[in-house]
Amino acid sequence: MSFNRRNFLKGMGLLGLGASIPTQAKSTDQHKIAGNESTVQSEIFDFAAAPYLQNLQADHVTICSIFTKPCFAWVERLDANGKVLETIYQVEDGMRNANVEHFKFKVRRNGSEIKYRVVAKEVTKFDPYKIEYGKQIQSADFTAQLAQPDQDQISCLILNDIHETKESYGLLYNQSKLVKKDLVFLNGDSFHYVTTAKDLTEKLLQPVTTSFASISPFVMVRGNHETRGKFARDFKQYFDYPENKFYHSFKMGPIYWIVLDSGEDKPDEHEVYGGTVDYDHYRLEQKAWLEKVLKSKERKSAKHTIVVTHIPFHHSDDWHGTQHNKLCFHEVLQNNKVDAVISGHTHEHSFHAPDNEHNYYVLIGGGPKAGNRTYIEVKAQGKQLQVDLIKENGEQIQGFRKG
């Protein structure tokens, strides 16, 4: 662990406890949670955050929406004049999702542009033979220009280690000079830990939808801090992933993207986990998967390959998680000629060209504090690839070009 990251975690009261909550903090949290529950019951029915785009695929994109009270919701797909072309529900086993606060709508895409809004009505009664509704609300109309897997160019933005500094999302997104951001990757540690659904809405979903997420799909890469807290096991349901896995791969534009889930930084048997984790076997599972996807036809059809993973396994620390990530993934990547591995975690930005240790570029983003924040821009057109590590003020740190 780097000196700066150590100081940051110490200042947050997280060092040495693996982000576990001290006894006093726990009782305070429980008091607040109880207070939140009573508040939620009395608050008005509304969007908890604006709709947000997930899981961009060749034939569809997922629109997620979250509300303050249980409801029945749907997506209206619109034409250029705002006329409803199609109404889309979340359907499973013949039932339209209802009487819940969170929805995922799989929306077919026939081209690059999609215009939509989300509509919902509060459920006031959901009895076996009688369902009643209350107030109906709708979001603003949003127009998203979506990338296609077979298009010749793509531009993507990668952020990391926001650690609940909510204003950083808009600041870094707007500072980026990319004309279009086809995808945004949040490369881990958006949180200190996750205790309630309100953590997700207030610390992530509200700021990212205010900035970009209703029109630019984002990929939530799990960092080691997202694994912590009593809501960590519910975390994934608020996002959408191929095959419902944090680790996944896809081709978008000329780039084949591989997203790894680096897991925790400490050994599985560490006391802070209380016997509840098994990241070593999970990383071995990913290794077997990684060996297959790197040989896939989809990967071979791409001109570039970029790996996004939170914990860097080069130019980092000697903690167990770092070393086990290296043991699982480095040789596989080394033998399959990837272009770059992009990470965060250390809270110290760094750039490393291929050398005797690794034949791919290693980029590590900075930390959450003002003056140490960074963003990474990835641009590709045909056989040309450009990746830049940039300070929050727009000053380039370093980058590389290919083709």
Protein language model regions, located:
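Short, solvent-exposed loop/turn segments at secondary-structure junctions
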Residues: 194, 315-317, 350
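Alpha/beta-hydrolase fold active-site loops
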Residues: 154, 182, 247, 254-255, ...
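Extended active-site neighborhood of metal-dependent phosphoesterases/phosphodiesterases
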Residues: 118-143, 148, 198-295, 299, ...
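Active-site neighborhood of phospho(di)ester-bond hydrolases with catalytic His/Asp-centered motifs
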Residues: 158-160, 184-189, 218-224, 306-310, ...
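Substrate-binding cleft/loops of secretory-pathway carbohydrate-active enzymes
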Residues: 320-321, 354
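Short acidic, glycine-rich surface-loop motifs adjacent to enzyme active sites
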Residues: 297-317
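Acidic, histidine-bearing metal-coordination/catalytic regions of metal-dependent phosphoesterases
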Residues: 2-158, 163, 178, 389-403
